[in-house]
Amino acid sequence: MNLALKSPAPRSGILDIAAYVPGKEHAPGVAKVHKLSSNETPLGASPRAIEAFQKAAFNLERYPDGQANALKEAIAAVHGLNPANILCGNGSDELLGLLCHTYLGPGDEGIVTEHGFLVYKIQITASGGTPVTVKERQERVDVDAILAAVTERTKIVFIANPANPTGTYIPVEEVRRLHAGLPAGVLLVLDAAYAEYVRRNDYEAGLELVSSNRNVVMTRTFSKIYGLAGLRIGWMYAPRDVVEALDRVRGPFNLNAAAIAAGAAAIRDQAFVAAAVDQNHTWLAKIGQALTDIGLRVTPSVTNFVLIHFPEEAGMSASDADAYLTSRGFILRAVGAYGFPNALRMTIGSEEANKGVVAALTEFMGRK
């Protein structure tokens, strides 16, 4: 006991964590704003999900199902899974945190990649562990670099596939090679938040690896293609012993009733999902080509966003472009915290928003 303290002190390391900062939402003084900073779908939620959400309003006095069984069963039906291997959470962020708090402690290490989702480092550190950052290769996860970083202290490895903010992915054979090189006691976490958008024959979100191994989990979200970011719904497919371990430490009612109902309705409406995939696929190609045509480098993406790189010239930097776009009502995401100080991430939005950004950046680049 330290009687000299004048107020409660956080655990060592907590105040060293840089708080997560979401994408900005406002453009002061602009009448119409197009928010393209958080990878939200321009199509909104399925009408079926909205209807289910509205119906849930008539039972607000009742606690939700603590196991979210209706949602688990809907997920299982769509993906052909066993509901017993599914755990739902208040966004996949909660599940990532639960994994760290369950499998990491002081002296343990968690491996992340240099441009990986910032929440990985936050949760590793918050759990008392030490994040170990490995280099990527050409803005892609480098399997060899990860395997070279594994030590006897490594307990967990995080990869986002596809990755955010690059939009790149690694083929399933590379994921298998990564898993094969890890000790059995190391947990491989495959964050597949953008899996629904991928149209590549050599991609697999993680269902196969989880089904055949005891040290792999896959996390998914309803915040992107399903348009339910405001409800915070995530899910995890994992070996039964991992699900049981996390069930011991998660909150007893971690997913609200409206989220359960809307999520179940959304995932069953696969026609709506297919329309969203088609819309994104069309505009992803158009945006990439249009930005390349005006002299910008765009990282090839398989997701619903693109990473745009700007010239290393005075007045032409990403921060200059960000200010220029914001003044015209287009909000993109600065990604300096992800190791890209001279790039912006753009969500694929509505036709109006997409064309508007291209027009604004054409004007911006024409000032050289």
UniProtKB/Swiss-Prot annotation:
EC number: 2.6.1.9
Domain of life: Bacteria
Keywords, in A-Z order: Amino-acid biosynthesis, Aminotransferase, Histidine biosynthesis, Pyridoxal phosphate, Transferase
Cofactor annotation: pyridoxal 5'-phosphate
Single GO molecular function: pyridoxal phosphate binding
GO annotation (BP), single: L-histidine biosynthetic process
Annotated positions of the N6-(pyridoxal phosphate)lysine modification: 224
SUPFAM superfamilies hit by this protein: PLP-dependent transferases
Pathway: Amino-acid biosynthesis; L-histidine biosynthesis; L-histidine from 5-phospho-alpha-D-ribose 1-diphosphate: step 7/9
Catalysis performed (reactions): L-histidinol phosphate + 2-oxoglutarate = 3-(imidazol-4-yl)-2-oxopropyl phosphate + L-glutamate
Classification via NCBIfam families: hisC (TIGR01141)
PANTHER family (UniProt xref): HISTIDINOL-PHOSPHATE AMINOTRANSFERASE (PTHR43643:SF3), HISTIDINOL-PHOSPHATE AMINOTRANSFERASE 2 (PTHR43643)
Subunit text: Homodimer.
Family in the record: Belongs to the class-II pyridoxal-phosphate-dependent aminotransferase family. Histidinol-phosphate aminotransferase subfamily.
Record-linked HAMAP family: HisC_aminotrans_2
Record's protein name: Histidinol-phosphate aminotransferase 1
